[in-house]
Amino acid sequence: MEAPSAYNDARVVAAREKLASKFRELRPDHEDTRIMAAMDLAATAHDGQFRRSGEPYVTHPVEVALICLELRLDNDGIIAALLHDVIEDTEVTNAEVRAQFGEDVVQLVEGVTKLEKGVRLDGTANQAARAETLRAAESLRKMLIAMSLDIRVMIIKLADRLHNMRTLDSMPSDRRIRIAQETMDVYAPLAARLGIWQIKWQLEDLSFKVLHPKEFREITEAVAKSRQHREDELKESIRILKERLESKGLHNTQVIGRPKHLYSIFNKVVKQGIPFEQIYDLIALRVIVSQPYECYLALGYVHDLWLPMQGLFSDYISAPKPNGYQSLHTKVIGPHGEPIEVQIRTREMHEIAEYGVAAHFAYKEGERANVRGEAIAELRKQIADWSNDSSNSREFLKAVSTDFFSEQVFVFTPKGDVLDLPAGSTPIDFAFRVHTDLGLITVGAKINGRIVPLSTKLQNGDRVELVTRRDAQPSLDWLEFVQSQHARSKIRAYFRRRNRAENTSRGKEAIEAELKRLGLEPRALTADDSVQKVLVHFKQVDNVADLFARVGEGLVSVQSVAMRLRELVRPEAPAEPTGGGKNRYQAL
């Protein structure tokens, strides 16, 4: 058979050889015929097409396929990565792909193509939620729904974005910034939630370089200056620890250094206000053992060797993160008196930690797939909940921005299961996350065995126990402190179902109680001038009865009405503008 004319270009030939070599290296027991047939189809279909950099276009899908190979995606996923642009950008049809590679590949290619057709996000997820950017909402909704149908679609899309970020230099400046911001706000958090950490940190560092070039350069130079010193310390720490583990009988153990990523250093400088020269924990070790019980043995030997730092130990083996991540984390004072972070895990745990949900497709049998399968099932359930709770794309985006892209806390149920919730969540958020019916009848909570107010913010590692009563009802006050959009929507839905008269009465009582708390007389509600001035601030409210009803339904905040009345009855001087700190990165 005559070779495709695309192979007249040495760069395309080199790309094909690179793919074949990597496939044989990582999958020596697999036949590469279908993979190379997909390569040939992609080369032929994209023949004559070039990237902005001048490279033959087919080098892009090849690089995407190589990233997917590294992520341990299955062979159909690799083929789909090679063909992910052919239906959209060439004359190749679905029928041709189906005839040669089967229905599974067609479904994957179509899934990625639909994402490509989606409208680009115009700004960050959080900004889009605040501005209610409909196009952003539609795009993100499409992306997450595609992900829930087949996670491999999202893995291919992440690989596609990673290669585009690696080759961003040929783009105009404004487009680079837009793509980098979108990557930082959407794709990096998605990679994190899928547990694909090696993709997450690369996306963050590449985005950081574009969005904050000055700070990127400064941190890169600072890291370079101290590199030799750190490498010497790292080598010595690895040698000392490996010798100790060997002497204790852990012979088949890897001890490797793990670099701190530039964006994580930048975050520490910005969020904690620590000058770079005072960041000492730039050294991190990873210990990889054969069996789970050896993780705990190794932990004991590490703590015997070096002094552990109090309060900085986490056990994600007995209580895995919801995305399936398992490892022991500890921080110790190393041989030179500087903090060293140590992570201890088995090889299988390491696969999951590095490759996230993609590891699920590398294993088809036994327990190794169970943790990953449960994580995928939980993710699909969350996406379904967001869709069911949201009446439109804007609400969906707001829910995802709050519940998915925000920082998370990990807490325990009484049975020891782990739930992830948005940072700042309360026992009420926890209750609704477990089950809506449980949230509706919650009357109290215990955290770590101690009774606490329902507005208490949960911390990592908290064990939460709920107190319920069958005849209990939710409170409108909960809307003032719940953090998750899921809990908020369920509480509002409960009050919307009540009849209008009851909601009107409930809303009026709630406002009167809040006015008393603020030291105002409830008669402020009957002052026509005050009420009319308050009404203009609330959309879709025609009269005071409407206002009471919407408060009773949970659609308007009790506090917002009371504060408006307070401003009219007892106006206060405007607050003084607050001054800025001295952190050199404050404006970023």
Task: Tell what function each PLM region has.
Residues N8, V13-A15, N94, G102-V105, ...:
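Internal insertion modules embedded within essential enzymes
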Residues M1-P28:
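Short, contiguous pre-domain boundary segments
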